[in-house]
């Protein structure tokens, strides 16, 4: 007997139930209205906030800026008037920010250390770094990691 991962079985079962009409259609669910309150300019026309995370304790958004290789920090304690309050330069740790996440009292960014290619032009995996900093942008540590 062929074994399927649990997630595959769940998806197949849910699909079958939807087809059979046994699950409520999304149209029957309560609707959610989203209203824009404000927007934040992420740069001077160069770079953009590709990946962002929110830290509730500091009321700040931390966003990757791949062009500048930084994590930009935005204070949204006054939601109607957000402002950029700083950035963390990641060039000392690597050359390509790939992710950011916030939790407790720290923020973690992941960076590639170098872009390496084989003789045939195929990208090769190199060790990367994680950069741990506080919500004010002060770097606390930067241990090596594998497979970034």
What do these predicted ranges mean?
Residues 1-26:
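Gram-negative bacterial Sec-dependent N-terminal signal peptides
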Residues 28-148:
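Mobile, glycine-rich extracellular loop/lid and propeptide segments
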């Amino acid at each position: 007997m062929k074994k399927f991962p649990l997630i595959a079985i769940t998806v197949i079962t849910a699909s079958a139930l939807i087809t059979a009409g046994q699950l409520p259609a999304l149209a029957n669910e309560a609707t959610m209205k989203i209203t824009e309150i404000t927007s934040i300019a992420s740069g001077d026309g160069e770079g953009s906030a590709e990946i962002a995370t929110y830290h509730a304790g500091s009321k700040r958004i931390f966003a990757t800026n791949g062009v500048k290789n930084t994590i930009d920090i935005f204070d949204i304690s006054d939601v109607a008037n957000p402002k950029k309050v700083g950035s963390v330069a990641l060039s000392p740790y690597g050359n390509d920010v790939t992710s950011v996440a916030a939790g407790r009292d720290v923020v973690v960014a992941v960076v590639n250390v170098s872009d390496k290619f084989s003789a045939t032009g195929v990208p090769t995996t190199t060790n990367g770094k994680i950069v741990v900093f506080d919500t004010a942008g002060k770097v606390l540590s930067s241990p090596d990691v594998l497979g970034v």
